[in-house]
């Protein structure tokens, strides 16, 4: 109640009670009303205060709620982080468990591998050792047979190579057949095999080590290469594939790899068997003519070793080793490379012949098929592609050739079957002939290229025997002195009997090696 209302009510009360107006009562009424007004104002103030307090409380509640929401969000984030951390820990634990499992599995596998590896290693070692033994034995047998078959030409070659070192040439051997007859006349029929015992003792391990080293290098290159066709492969220009060595192999070596393998084979075999070669040559020379180099000094292989060691020391057993390595390493390198190349060409020719003969003998056509095939041939430039993989023979051929109408009408399956049916015949008979022919060609090429180095090797090996003068300081000095004293022709003395010796020797050696290797591998497979 405000003052205006109060005045109005006061006026009305005075008017109504004008007859009974009492100032004291009016004053009391005014005071009570004023007190009421004050009370009302205080109540209003309290209400306002309460409202403000409520508003403040609502704000506090809202702020608290916001804080709680923030806390909840933070808790949610923390929970999510904890979940992520737990997931990470779980994944890490899983990874660690997998690693531990893998390690345990590896340990188990290693344990098994040790058993397997011991079984595999035992098997692989056994197989490797069996293979190595097979290579070694096959090469040794091949060397012994091939050198025994050509022992007379071997001895005659050595005599003619070194007889120019003597001042007395009146009793020297000249020619090939005539010299062989003269040798038999002078020394008897057994003279053909004089020194052959030492020759076999030297050549047999030499040949075995040579083939073993070559196969080892070949396996190393095959295991560490992708075997992609190379432009430098030995049959480049034929079919673009790699070198194939021997029946049953699937070699794809390049020419440098093949030559390197051959060089390592020659180096290893020469170093380990060189003293035997020195003994062999000295035994072959003695008694051949009346010069000092041919005098009888040695009574067999054992006596030769001890006498050379006693008279000349260990150096005597390795005299001319540098020159020998310089001549034998390229010799063996070229020999293997040419053999591999000729073998691929030979088998390719045989297969081409079989393909053409099979197609001509098994195909018949009609006039309509001829016309249709003529159209097809025009589209294909009158050519067809025949692909055949003969793993047993190590051949991978892609032959593209023009063919007749009859051959072009033959189904490819019939052509493949007809060739496959002849595969056994190829493996049985033709393989040996192919190996023999390729070995002979390889021997002829190698002999022509490397013969001068062989002359140097032999002369360096025998100089100084029996107190004779040492003529040459080294291989280069020997080359200059031979050219100045005897001429270029001296480097080819004895090459005719050498051809008679080397060509069949290399041919027999490769052919016998392949046969023995196949027989040995078949026995191991059966076991």
UniProtKB/Swiss-Prot annotation:
BP GO annotations: adenine nucleotide transport
Region (Disordered): 1-29
Membrane topology type: Multi-pass membrane protein
Keyword terms of this UniProt record: Membrane, Mitochondrion, Mitochondrion inner membrane, Repeat, Transmembrane, Transmembrane helix, Transport
Molecular function via GO: nucleotide transmembrane transporter activity
Pfam family, one: Mito_carr
Bias (Polar residues) ranges: 15-29
Basic and acidic residues composition bias: residue spans: 1-14
First-listed, main subcellular location of the protein, grouped into a coarse class: mitochondrion
Solcar repeat copies, ranges: 130-220, 253-345, 430-519
Compartments, record wording: Mitochondrion inner membrane
Positions of transmembrane segments: 133-153, 188-208, 259-279, 325-345, 436-456, 488-508
Mitochondrial matrix side: 154-187, 280-324, 457-487
Keyword Transport: yes
Gene3D superfamilies given in the database record: Mitochondrial carrier domain
Role description: Mitochondrial solute carriers shuttle metabolites, nucleotides, and cofactors through the mitochondrial inner membrane.
Family: Belongs to the mitochondrial carrier (TC 2.A.29) family.
Full protein name: Mitochondrial substrate carrier family protein V
Gene this chain is encoded by: mcfV
């Amino acid at each position: 109640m405000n003052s205006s209302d109060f005045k109005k009510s006061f006026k009305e009360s005075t008017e109504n009670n004008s007859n009974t107006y009492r100032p004291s009562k009016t004053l009391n009424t005014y005071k009570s009303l004023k007190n009421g007004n004050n009370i009302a104002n205080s109540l209003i103030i309290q209400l306002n205060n309460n409202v403000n307090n409520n508003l403040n409380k609502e704000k506090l509640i809202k702020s608290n709620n916001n804080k709680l929401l923030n806390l909840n969000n933070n808790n949610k984030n923390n929970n999510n982080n904890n979940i992520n951390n737990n997931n990470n820990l779980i994944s890490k634990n899983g990874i660690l468990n997998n690693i531990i499992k893998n390690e345990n599995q590896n340990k188990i596998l290693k344990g098994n591998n040790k058993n397997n590896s011991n079984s595999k290693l035992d098997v692989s070692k056994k197989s490797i050792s069996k293979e190595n033994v097979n290579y070694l034995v096959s090469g040794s047998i091949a060397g012994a047979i091939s050198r025994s078959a050509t022992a007379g030409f071997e001895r005659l070659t050595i005599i003619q190579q070194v007889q120019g070192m003597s001042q007395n040439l009146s009793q020297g051997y000249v020619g090939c057949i005539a010299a062989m007859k003269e040798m038999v006349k002078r020394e008897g029929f057994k003279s053909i095999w004089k020194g052959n015992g030492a020759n076999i003792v030297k050549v047999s391990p030499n040949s075995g080590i040579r083939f073993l080293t070559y196969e080892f290098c070949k396996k190393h290159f095959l295991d560490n290469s992708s075997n992609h066709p190379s432009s430098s492969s030995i049959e480049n220009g034929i079919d673009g594939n790699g070198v194939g060595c021997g029946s049953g192999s699937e070699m794809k070596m390049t020419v440098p790899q093949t030559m390197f393998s051959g060089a390592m084979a020659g180096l290893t075999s020469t170093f380990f068997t060189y003293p035997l070669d020195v003994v062999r040559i000295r035994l072959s020379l003695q008694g051949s003519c009346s010069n000092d180099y041919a005098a009888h000094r040695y009574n067999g292989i054992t006596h030769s070793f001890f006498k050379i060691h006693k008279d000349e020391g260990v150096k005597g057993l390795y005299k001319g080793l540098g020159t020998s390595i310089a001549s034998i390493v390229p010799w063996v390198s070229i020999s293997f490379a040419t053999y591999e190349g000729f073998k691929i060409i030979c088998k390719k020719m045989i297969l081409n012949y079989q393909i053409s003969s099979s197609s001509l003998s098994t195909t018949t056509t009609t006039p309509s098929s001829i016309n249709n095939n003529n159209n097809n041939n025009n589209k294909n430039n009158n050519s067809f592609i025949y692909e055949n993989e003969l793993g047993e023979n190590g051949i991978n051929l892609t032959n593209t050739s023009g063919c007749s109408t009859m051959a072009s009408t033959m189904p490819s399956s019939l052509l493949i079957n007809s060739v496959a049916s002849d595969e056994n015949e190829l493996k049985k008979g033709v393989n040996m002939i192919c190996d023999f022919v390729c070995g002979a060609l390889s021997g002829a090429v190698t002999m022509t290229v490397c013969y001068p180095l062989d002359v140097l090797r032999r002369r360096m090996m025998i100089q100084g025997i029996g107190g004779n003068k040492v003529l040459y300081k080294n291989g280069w000095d020997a080359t200059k002195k031979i050219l100045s004293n005897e001429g270029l022709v001296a480097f080819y003395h004895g090459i005719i009997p050498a051809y008679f010796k080397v060509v069949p020797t290399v041919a027999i050696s490769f052919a016998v090696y392949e046969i023995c290797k196949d027989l040995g591998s078949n026995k191991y497979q059966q076991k």
